[in-house]
Swiss-Prot record:
Its main location: membrane. It comes from the Bacteria. The gene is ndhO. The keyword Membrane applies. One of its GO terms (cellular component) is plasma membrane-derived thylakoid membrane. NDH-1 shuttles electrons from an unknown electron donor, via FMN and iron-sulfur (Fe-S) centers, to quinones in the respiratory and/or the photosynthetic chain. The immediate electron acceptor for the enzyme in this species is believed to be plastoquinone. Couples the redox reaction to proton translocation, and thus conserves the redox energy in a proton gradient. Cyanobacterial NDH-1 also plays a role in inorganic carbon-concentration. It is a peripheral membrane protein. It is found in: Cellular thylakoid membrane. Belongs to the complex I NdhO subunit family. This is NAD(P)H-quinone oxidoreductase subunit O. Coiled coil: none annotated. It comes from Parasynechococcus marenigrum (strain WH8102). It catalyses: a plastoquinone + NADH + (n+1) H(+)(in) = a plastoquinol + NAD(+) + n H(+)(out); a plastoquinone + NADPH + (n+1) H(+)(in) = a plastoquinol + NADP(+) + n H(+)(out).
Protein backbone atom coordinates (compact mmCIF):
# COMPACT_ATOMS: atom_id res chain seq x y z
CA UNK A 1 0.00 0.00 0.00
CA UNK A 2 1.16 3.50 -0.75
CA UNK A 3 1.33 5.98 2.06
CA UNK A 4 -0.94 8.98 1.77
CA UNK A 5 0.33 12.44 2.50
CA UNK A 6 -1.59 13.83 5.48
CA UNK A 7 -0.64 17.44 4.73
CA UNK A 8 -3.41 19.72 3.56
CA UNK A 9 -2.97 20.93 -0.01
CA UNK A 10 -1.49 24.41 -0.30
CA UNK A 11 -3.86 27.19 -1.26
CA UNK A 12 -3.67 28.16 -4.88
CA UNK A 13 -1.91 31.45 -5.47
CA UNK A 14 -4.30 34.08 -6.88
CA UNK A 15 -3.90 34.81 -10.57
CA UNK A 16 -1.53 37.67 -11.30
CA UNK A 17 -3.14 40.87 -12.49
CA UNK A 18 -2.43 41.79 -16.09
CA UNK A 19 -2.64 44.88 -18.22
CA UNK A 20 -6.29 45.75 -18.88
CA UNK A 21 -7.59 44.12 -15.67
CA UNK A 22 -10.26 45.93 -13.67
CA UNK A 23 -8.93 46.53 -10.17
CA UNK A 24 -9.62 48.22 -6.86
CA UNK A 25 -7.33 49.02 -3.93
CA UNK A 26 -7.22 46.69 -0.94
CA UNK A 27 -7.89 49.05 1.98
CA UNK A 28 -5.93 47.06 4.60
CA UNK A 29 -2.84 46.78 2.37
CA UNK A 30 -2.96 50.49 1.48
CA UNK A 31 -3.67 52.16 4.85
CA UNK A 32 -0.22 51.83 6.48
CA UNK A 33 1.82 51.96 3.28
CA UNK A 34 4.36 54.49 2.07
CA UNK A 35 1.94 55.47 -0.71
CA UNK A 36 -0.77 56.32 1.83
CA UNK A 37 1.68 58.38 3.89
CA UNK A 38 2.67 60.37 0.78
CA UNK A 39 -0.95 61.12 -0.17
CA UNK A 40 -3.86 63.02 1.33
CA UNK A 41 -4.75 61.91 4.88
CA UNK A 42 -8.06 60.48 3.66
CA UNK A 43 -8.01 58.45 0.46
CA UNK A 44 -10.99 58.88 -1.88
CA UNK A 45 -13.60 56.13 -1.66
CA UNK A 46 -13.59 55.43 -5.40
CA UNK A 47 -10.15 53.76 -5.23
CA UNK A 48 -11.51 51.15 -2.80
CA UNK A 49 -14.79 50.65 -4.71
CA UNK A 50 -13.24 50.42 -8.19
CA UNK A 51 -13.14 49.67 -10.95
CA UNK A 52 -9.93 51.14 -12.21
CA UNK A 53 -8.11 49.88 -15.28
CA UNK A 54 -4.59 48.53 -14.90
CA UNK A 55 -2.71 50.32 -17.69
CA UNK A 56 0.86 49.19 -17.16
CA UNK A 57 2.83 46.86 -14.90
CA UNK A 58 6.50 47.58 -14.17
CA UNK A 59 8.14 45.41 -11.55
CA UNK A 60 6.18 45.59 -8.30
CA UNK A 61 4.08 48.58 -9.39
CA UNK A 62 1.02 49.07 -11.57
CA UNK A 63 -0.40 52.20 -13.17
CA UNK A 64 -4.15 52.54 -12.61
CA UNK A 65 -6.59 54.81 -14.47
CA UNK A 66 -9.92 55.55 -12.82
CA UNK A 67 -13.09 56.31 -14.78
CA UNK A 68 -13.05 59.84 -13.37
CA UNK A 69 -11.31 63.09 -14.28
CA UNK A 70 -8.33 62.39 -12.01
CA UNK A 71 -4.66 61.62 -12.78
CA UNK A 72 -3.44 58.04 -13.21
CA UNK A 73 -1.70 56.62 -10.14
CA UNK A 74 1.10 54.12 -9.51
CA UNK A 75 0.47 51.64 -6.70
CA UNK A 76 2.23 48.50 -5.52
CA UNK A 77 0.73 45.39 -7.07
CA UNK A 78 0.17 43.80 -3.64
CA UNK A 79 -2.24 46.67 -2.86
CA UNK A 80 -4.43 45.91 -5.88
CA UNK A 81 -7.11 43.25 -6.20
CA UNK A 82 -9.41 42.19 -8.99
CA UNK A 83 -12.89 43.70 -9.23
CA UNK A 84 -14.39 40.45 -10.40
Amino acid sequence: MAETDSKAPAKAKPAALRKGALVKVNRSAYNDSLEAAASDPTAPDYIFEGPGELLLVKGDYGQVRWNRPVPDVWLRMDQLESCG
